């Protein structure tokens, strides 16, 4: 046997193992991208199985949130809380004055900066530590994420129009992956003017027959898609496809500082439009676990370290 067949066989074995994990890249996995397997229902089966598990997980954690919040999430795919932090002024002052190492990434014309909420950061910012250790914060994130394990948490800065490159790819409506996942945003500045709002299609987190068929069709062509994010399993969607699924108009959240949004990012979402340079700063959390097991193990940090560059002694509110 030559080297090439051995390599192909090894990739197929690895790809087969990925079927039972959170693996989502059609470009990198010959099993997930197999047209024959997806015509036979592989992708649709993974999506369906993952959603059944997510429903079960959330049912076990339903006591953590109010009936009103559960109903809002079931209807919309997100929970919104205004004036969330009681002593918001203290938290904001801490974040503004805190300087440390950060990681930055540029996608298109937009910069994303992340400051890790590690032990040192939380020790230096007691009001922020109080927030992320509070039941109000943890319970909402746990319920939508379907897990009580602590999510990945950062101070995140979004700076728009920092160059003359292509548009930010996050401004296109998309689902993060094939299974339910949680993201949270506590906005530290008002989302107004040219500050890009979080945008979400209400109800698009639900696995309807129309959505499942759309997922099946996307899986047949994803590996050859022009869009790299689609090839990597974060499917993009246009207005015509949203309308075909009879989904409502997207909601743009132009909200005041101290507003929390926790959402299931299987739902279609995007970073809203920004016509001029602007900055958005938020406490950002991301929860993702292996989608097929009732007690999911922790997954590695999903974003490639090579896409970020280090930056020393920076504040979340510093310019790009």
Name each model feature, range by range.
Residues 1-75:
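Fe(II)/2-oxoglutarate
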Residues 85-88, 159, 178, 191-193, ...:
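Short, solvent-exposed loop/turn segments at secondary-structure junctions
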Residues 203-214, 304-320:
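Short, cationic low-complexity segments
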């Amino acid at each position: 046997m030559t080297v090439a067949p051995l390599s192909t066989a090894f990739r197929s074995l690895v790809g087969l193992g990925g079927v039972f994990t959170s693996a989502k890249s059609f470009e990198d996995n010959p099993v997930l991208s197999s047209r024959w397997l997806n015509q036979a229902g592989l992708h649709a089966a993974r999506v369906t199985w993952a959603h059944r598990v997510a429903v079960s997980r959330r049912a076990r954690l339903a006591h953590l949130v109010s009936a009103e919040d559960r109903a809002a999430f079931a209807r919309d795919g997100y929970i919104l809380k205004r004036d969330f932090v009681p002593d918001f002024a203290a938290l904001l002052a801490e974040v503004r004055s805190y300087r440390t190492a950060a990681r930055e990434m540029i996608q298109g014309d937009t910069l994303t900066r992340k400051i890790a909420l590690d032990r040192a950061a939380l020790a230096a910012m007691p009001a922020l530590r109080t927030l992320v250790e509070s039941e109000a914060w943890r319970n909402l994130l746990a319920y939508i994420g379907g897990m009580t394990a602590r999510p990945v948490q950062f101070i995140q800065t979004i700076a728009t129009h920092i160059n003359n490159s292509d548009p930010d790819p996050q401004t296109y409506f998309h689902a993060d992956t094939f299974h339910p996942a949680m993201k949270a945003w506590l906005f530290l500045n008002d989302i107004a003017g040219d500050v890009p709002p979080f945008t979400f299609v209400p109800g698009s987190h639900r696995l309807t027959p129309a959505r499942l068929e759309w997922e099946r069709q996307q899986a047949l062509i994803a590996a050859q898609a022009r869009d790299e994010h689609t090839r990597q399993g974060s499917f993009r969607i246009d207005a015509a496809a949203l309308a075909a699924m009879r989904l409502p108009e997207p909601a743009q959240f132009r909200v005041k500082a101290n507003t929390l949004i926790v959402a299931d990012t299987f739902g279609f979402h995007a970073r809203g439009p920004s016509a001029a340079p602007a900055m958005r700063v938020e406490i950002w959390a991301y929860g993702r676990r292996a989608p097929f097991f009732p007690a999911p193990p922790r997954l590695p940090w999903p974003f490639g370290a090579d896409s970020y560059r280090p930056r020393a002694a920076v504040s979340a509110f510093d310019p790009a």
